[in-house]
Amino acid sequence: MLSSTLRVAVVCVSNVNRSMEAHSILRRKGLSVRSFGTESHVRLPGPRPNRPVVYDFATTYKEMYNDLLRKDRERYTRNGILHILGRNERIKPGPERFQECTDSFDVIFTCEESVYDTVVEDLCSREQQTFQPVHVINMEIQDTLEDATLGAFLICEICQCLQQSDDMEDNLEELLLQMEEKAGKSFLHTVCFY
């Protein structure tokens, strides 16, 4: 068993759907979790596919919710965005950017390869101070409500296995191989240092 609670981060593009669904499920299971996005702005589906609604990361989930409610209650209820923002508001005030976080984690899950690349690049650009390892694991999760939920449960299962592991460093590769076979997904994995 790990001597302390596993510290987990989940990162997607905007810190709205995939990372927050995982945040919600991991938190309910009692895990120490934070969630983040990596882009410069939060982008939500707009009136047309090529016209997203764009917010600054300083905008709270409640402000986004109220803005979309005013713009088109029916559209944003139907596509699930109001439900997502309501859930998010119950977890934390607003989205956070990974690049602005100075906390350390044991494991960071990313939800798409471009986010994985950004997280690894950011960690490698920081000055190493403690040399504490952090495992960065990418799992491709489509940005849909259903896929976010399925991905969150898989992340939760991996975290619970790691939490029960006698030696995370030795067991992680084998665990990821088992999960790849079980889920039919392949994972990217690397180790960075704080």
UniProtKB/Swiss-Prot annotation:
InterPro entries: Ptyr_pPase_sf (IPR036196), RNA_pol_II_suA (IPR006811). It is found in: Nucleus. Its EC number is 3.1.3.16. It holds the Pfam family Ssu72. GO terms for cellular component: mRNA cleavage and polyadenylation specificity factor complex. Coiled coil: none annotated. PANTHER family: RNA POLYMERASE II SUBUNIT A C-TERMINAL DOMAIN PHOSPHATASE. This is RNA polymerase II subunit A C-terminal domain phosphatase SSU72 like protein 5. It comes from Homo sapiens (Human).
